[in-house]
Amino acid sequence: MWLTKSSVGRKVVMSVTGLFLILFITFHAVMNAVALVSMDAYEAICHFLGANWYALAGTAVIAAGVVLHIVYAFWLTIQNRKARGNDRYAVNKRPATVEWASQNMLALGIFVVCFMILHLVQFWAKMQLPEIQEMYLGQYGVDILGGKEAILGAFAQPWTLPIYLVGFAALWFHLTHGIWSAFQSVGTSNNVWLPRWKCVSNWWATIVCGLFAVEAIVFTIMACGCC
């Protein structure tokens, strides 16, 4: 199959799954911003999503996108290293034309995945997962946290904020390269559009990750009872 046997096909899969995940990350940042304005409204959104079939279907699609993106990232990295052979040891420093994020996308991606797992443990495992256990597995008596309770509980921990800020920084680097690279891989980039996509990438990543950072800081202040 072209998508698996061709290096171009594998890059297309990486690009499409990456763009899909970028949209989800953007939605997630905007949804969290609701909690900055009204915790009651945020609770209502969490209750609306919950463990209903459409929320579970969306979760399954997102999980599939993440898995595909990770698998193809390792696949392409191994393929590229085999193609370069010993040449990769010949150069000790990064060429001036190669961005730092570009050269470290796999490492950044691994760090982001570890950060994502922590986030899932702090929120999904305490909100949606218990609902699934109760609604579909008949395991009653499981503690189900609301959105506000989960936020305040997570950010009351002194280590949460610094880890999240480092995670958002890694995500920023990953997105600044990933967005324009994705459009380049699907053939929507040329000498005119490439600088534009790079500009869009920088702005998009800065706005989304900046919003995440502001949310984390405000949630920490709220959890400490300062407001």
Model-derived segments and their meaning:
Residues M1-C227:
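Membrane-embedded alpha-helical bundles that constitute the cytochrome b-like, heme-associated redox core
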